[in-house]
C-alpha cells in the first residue's frame, strides 16, 4: 500500500487574533508544523497547539520563520546565514520545551514561508537551517521542497533525514519550485484540481507545471494549508480520496 504523510501549518494565532482552523483540521492530518512566535504564534498558542496535537496522536514539528509578524513571514529578508541559524535554533528550541513539558517528542522542522522558499534555492540558507537542527537535535527530520538540491545537500552534510515535500494547493514552475504568491496563479482554488494534482504526485510521481510541462516529484509528505476559507472541507475531501485510493496516511518514521 502507498503511504504518504499529510502535514499542516498550525498554531498561527497570536494573542486575540485567531488564524486557521486548527481544531477542525487535526483529525485529517498525520503531522503538524507549529509556528514558534516569529512570523505567528505566541507561547500560549504554542502550548495549546502541542497539547491538542498529542491528543490526536499526530507528529509535531517546529515551523520557524522570519521575525516578520506583519508580513506573516512571507516576505524575503536580507539576512546572513548566521542570522538564519540563530533564528531557527531559537525557535525550534522554544517549541521543544513545550513538547517536552507535555510529555511528547518533537519529530521534525519545517521552515516557513519566505525562509522555506529562500532555502530551497539558496545553499547557504539551507545549510544554516540544517546546522541549527543538527546542533539542537540531529534526530529531527527536515521537511523541504521536493527535488531542492539546496535542501538535499544540506541534509546530507549534517546527516539529518530530509522529508521531501509537495503542496496540494500550490502551482509549480518548470524548475520544480513553487509559483510565487505574488502571482495570480500561485494557488489552486478548485478542490478537484488540487486533488487531481496530489494524486498525480503520490501515485505517478509528477506534477504539471503552470506551462504544462511534466515535472518529476517524489514526495514523502503533502502540505495542506489550514487557513483557507474551505480548508477543513478540502482536508476532509483529500483524506477520503486517499482512503478510496487505498493510500495510507502516516507520519514519516
From Swiss-Prot:
EC category name: hydrolase
Annotated EC: 3.5.2.9
Single GO BP term: carbohydrate metabolic process
Gene Ontology molecular function, alphabetical: 5-oxoprolinase (ATP-hydrolyzing) activity; ATP binding
Keywords assigned by UniProt, alphabetized: ATP-binding, Hydrolase, Nucleotide-binding
Function of the protein: Catalyzes the cleavage of 5-oxoproline to form L-glutamate coupled to the hydrolysis of ATP to ADP and inorganic phosphate.
Family to which the UniProt record says this protein belongs: Belongs to the LamB/PxpA family.
NCBIfam families attached to this UniProt entry: PRK05406.1-2, PRK05406.1-3, PRK05406.1-5
Protein name: 5-oxoprolinase subunit A
Amino acid at each position: 500500500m502507498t503511504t504518504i504523510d499529510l502535514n499542516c501549518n498550525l498554531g498561527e494565532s497570536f494573542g486575540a487574533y485567531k488564524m486557521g482552523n486548527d481544531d477542525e483540521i487535526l483529525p485529517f492530518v498525520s503531522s503538524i508544523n507549529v509556528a514558534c512566535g516569529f512570523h505567528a504564534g505566541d507561547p500560549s498558542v504554542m502550548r495549546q497547539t502541542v497539547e491538542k496535537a498529542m491528543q490526536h496522536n499526530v507528529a509535531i514539528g517546529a515551523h520557524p520563520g522570519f521575525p516578520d509578524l506583519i508580513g506573516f513571514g512571507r516576505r524575503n529578508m536580507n539576512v546572513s546565514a548566521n542570522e538564519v541559524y540563530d533564528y531557527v535554533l531559537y525557535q525550534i528550541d522554544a517549541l521543544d520545551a513545550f513538547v517536552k513539558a507535555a510529555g511528547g517528542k518533537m519529530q521534525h522542522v519545517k521552515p516557513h514561508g519566505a525562509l522555506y522558499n529562500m532555502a530551497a534555492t539558496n545553499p547557504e540558507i539551507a545549510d544554516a537551517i540544517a546546522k541549527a537542527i543538527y546542533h539542537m537535535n540531529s534526530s529531527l527530520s527536515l521537511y523541504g521542497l521536493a527535488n531542492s538540491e539546496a535542501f538535499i545537500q544540506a541534509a546530507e552534510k549534517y546527516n539529518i533525514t530530509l522529508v521531501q515535500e509537495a503542496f496540494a494547493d500550490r502551482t509549480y514552475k518548470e524548475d520544480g519550485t513553487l509559483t510565487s504568491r505574488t502571482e495570480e496563479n500561485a494557488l489552486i482554488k478548485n478542490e478537484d484540481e488540487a486533488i487531481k494534482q496530489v494524486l498525480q504526485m503520490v501515485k505517478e510521481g509528477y506534477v504539471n507545471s503552470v506551462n504544462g510541462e511534466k515535472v518529476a516529484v517524489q514526495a514523502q509528505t503533502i502540505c495542506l494549508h489550514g487557513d483557507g476559507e474551505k480548508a477543513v472541507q478540502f482536508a476532509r475531501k483529500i483524506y477520503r480520496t486517499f482512503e478510496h485510493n487505498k493510500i495510507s496516511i502516516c507520519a514519516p518514521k
